[in-house]
Amino acid sequence: MDDDKKLTSKDFLNQLVAKHYEGALQAKAEGKPVVWATSICPQELLETMDLATVYPENHAAAIGARKGALEFIENAEGKGYSSDNCSYARVNLGYADIQKAEAQDIPMPDLLFCCSNICNTVIKWYENLSKTLQIPLILFDMPFNHTYEVPEHSIRYMRGQIEYAIGQLEDFTKRKFDYDKFGEVMELSNATCEWWKKATDWAKVIPSPLNGFDMFNYMAMIVCMRGNADGHRLFKMWHDELEAKAKAGLGPWNSAEEQYRVMWDGIACWPHLSTTFKALKKYGINMVTSTYPDSWNVRYEKNDLSGMAKAYASNYANRNLDYDEDNVVR
């Protein structure tokens, strides 16, 4: 507890980012398998199996934020990948060929883990990686929700895929799946998501103690550390800091007052994040909510596999227009 008093959540965030990548590189060096996974996948399965996992979308965003994306995009397009593909895909496909980035290296994968609840691009992106690298792919095919609520047949379909994926992971690792540990990971993942939600909800206070662009920074860890104790500790720390600021009546910045509050819809513009932040701050504009970071508020009851299936099927990018309109209003 004393460490928490000395350490800010931002300090801890930076430590965890370094720990995440160093751990994956070390696992590879020790001959352990490494997984590349999409950002909103059933990571609880991977956490249960103690598989070192890297998220190419996080990595591509980091490369973009450091102005290093062009080399990888040009490489991917030179191999025939269309410029219509998102830069996340093109940066990663380029990195899979070059395998070196000044911003941050990641180990090459032994297994791919893909869930199509965020977009359809990830399907062909990961299929191409699987074919090029000659490694197995575990794919969760997520039907789009044309109805307002997630239909029961979609929940059953996704649950069946989760159950099948457990068998695939057992075949890949040559180890049995530990269902007791799975329950613990599910519980921790939900608790972490709850602290993430509680922390970001402080933006509802006027003035907001939260600088909305911080959500994009902390988001890296809600992607890759939802199911472990470090992620839980981080978001509890962040929540407590924001609560203290709110009670003290402090706004998002020390050098400016919050005058306008806006919602950010969609993905951050990673190469120009600083420019965007400074331009908005100059006019007292604070981004207090976004449809993007809330995507990782994946919650369900412990040991409820159908609830877990529904939670992963419920991502706003996988919902119909009526639902998305109401989500924006909420």
Describe every region a protein language model picked out.
Residues 48-77, 267-330:
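Redox- and metal-dependent alpha/beta enzyme cores, enriched for Fe-S-associated oxidoreductases
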Residues 37-105, 110, 117, 125-126:
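An N-terminal, globular interaction/scaffold subdomain
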Residues 76-84, 156-168, 307-317:
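A polyampholytic, Gly/Pro-enriched intrinsically disordered region
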